[in-house]
A protein has these predicted regions:
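Short boundary/loop segments of OB/S1/cold-shock single-stranded nucleic-acid-binding domains
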Residues: 17-32
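Short aromatic-glycine-enriched beta-strand elements
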Residues: 44-54
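Short nucleic-acid-contacting surface segments enriched for D/E, G, S/T with interspersed K/R
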Residues: 76-91
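Structural detector for short beta-strands of small beta-barrel domains
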Residues: 30-46
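Positively charged n-region of N-terminal signal peptides that target proteins for export
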Residues: 1-4
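OB-fold/S1-family single-stranded nucleic acid-binding modules
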Residues: 97-121
Length: 128
């Protein structure tokens, strides 16, 4: 009976850990810096998403998607849906997709005036 209970507990708990495992989705050992213009900010759970147009090496515009913390974590840190808006020029430092797709996990965002927002460097803003 204990083995059966442990098995079912394992089945329900493991997906929770899988959701927060970033290693398979993002290259956590690498950071890329991208400059561009925000096209959309999706301020909703489970994670705030930032979409940004970036010119690649050939001059072609590529729309990147960046995952950030959840709404309540960012709100506790003083950010809201007006912190970033479509049309803003920003620099995003991200852990890139492990699959090579134009996606990333936000390390920090730098506004046009040089102000750093939504940083998780040195544990300042851990992604939930």
């Amino acid at each position: 009976m204990k083995k059966l209970l442990a098995f079912f507990l394992f089945l329900f708990v493991m997906p929770l850990f899988a959701h927060h495992g970033r290693g398979a989705t993002y290259d956590m050992k690498k950071q890329v810096t991208l400059k561009g213009v925000i096209t959309e900010v999706s301020w909703r759970n489970p994670h705030v998403a930032i979409y940004m147009d970036v010119k690649d090496n050939d001059g072609k515009v590529v729309n990147w998607a960046f995952e950030n913390s959840n709404v309540s974590t960012l709100a506790r840190q003083g950010y809201n849906r007006n912190t970033l808006r479509a049309g803003q020029k920003i620099t995003a430092v991200v852990n890139p997709s492990a699959q090579g797709t134009p996606r990333g996990l936000v390390v920090k965002v730098i506004l046009a005036d040089g102000k750093v927002v939504m940083s998780r460097e040195s544990g300042a803003n851990p992604v939930d």
